[in-house]
Amino acid sequence: MKLTADRYAGASSSLTLDTDALSRYTDLVDLSIGDTDFVTDSRIIEAAARDARAGYTHYGFPQGDPQLIDAIRSSWKEDYNVDISRDEIFISASSCLGMSQLMTAVLNPGDEVIVLAPYFALYRQQIEMAGGVCVEVASYEEEAYALNAERLEKAITPKTRAIILNNPCNPTGAAYTRRDLELLAETARKHDLMLIGDEIYTRYVFEGEFIPMLTLPGIRDRLVTLNSFSKNFMMTGWRVGCIICPPELRKVIQWVNGAQIYTAPSISQRAAIEALAIRRDIEKLYVSRYRERMVYASDRIEKIPYMTIARPRGTFYLFPSIKKTGLSSKAFCAEAVNQAHVLMSPGCAFGACGEGYVRIAATQPMEKLAAAFDRLEQMKF
């Protein structure tokens, strides 16, 4: 008996890591995982526990906790002077699930979605599971991963449905300028395309400022913004995010969600309310530490003879080239585990133009980062 559908023939993870490395090397430094090393702030945990005892342990509202929806609206107004109606917000059980539900809601079979590569490793899977086609538009280290209008235009066909922009970008650390975003908006209007802003690391812009796509004029009718509490608030395990989009699309996403999990976890939504209330403190206490790590890691990479890097402007990821070694991304990562006891993600997992690169997550304390780079400097090829 065949157990799986034909469409999943040959399905495998794009991000293949040496998960046995930790058992082989007790001194392994794991720089592969995009999970913060800080525990969720105690005030958030305590608020969630208090609300759990008060009875927030049942199904919630399908659209999301009304108090959380209003807290999101207030934060957008205070932080970016953007007005958002309640009908435009849907609370998702993570932005990752939200993106999958969005693809299901907007794609017809064969629709093409442009992703700016290197891109978040799950985009292709999310698009293809919804019957779409993932189209990569490359960006390059030599251009500081800036948006290239000519390559973008060439990728657009009559089947193009949407463009996804991850800002700031996992894995490259690129943070896009207002001019980049205006160019993207102009292209979307010209070709009548949907714009999807995957804005997960909004607090992690270390050069310049984070510019939400919602601040651009004249694109609200074609714009979808995904936000998450995972990285900004050290809440990866709580699984809560939100989608901001036109009301008619929000209703369809909510319908899709109803057939899957019905509603995001009530207790996680209560935690998210507290997170927004103390967001200034969170930024001061935690995000500033990542800025220090990113500067340190960039400096160390620039001193390693076989690596080059376009210094990241945001996120907590670095994406150095290892082309000088002559190894593929996967082969280099295997050598790094065996020689240096350092685990990283191969760049090929993030699109074709990621081959020859590795992703480093600065999600370890400074002393472990230092140890990792000390060992990487000693590698022989």
Can you describe what each PLM-predicted range is?
Residues K2-G10, A21-Y25, V29, D35-D51, ...:
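PLP-dependent class I/II
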Residues V29-D37, R50-I69:
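A glycine-/small-polar-enriched, mobile loop at the entrance of the PLP active site in fold-type I
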Residues Y59-S92:
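Conserved N-terminal alpha-helix of the aminotransferase class I/II PLP-enzyme fold
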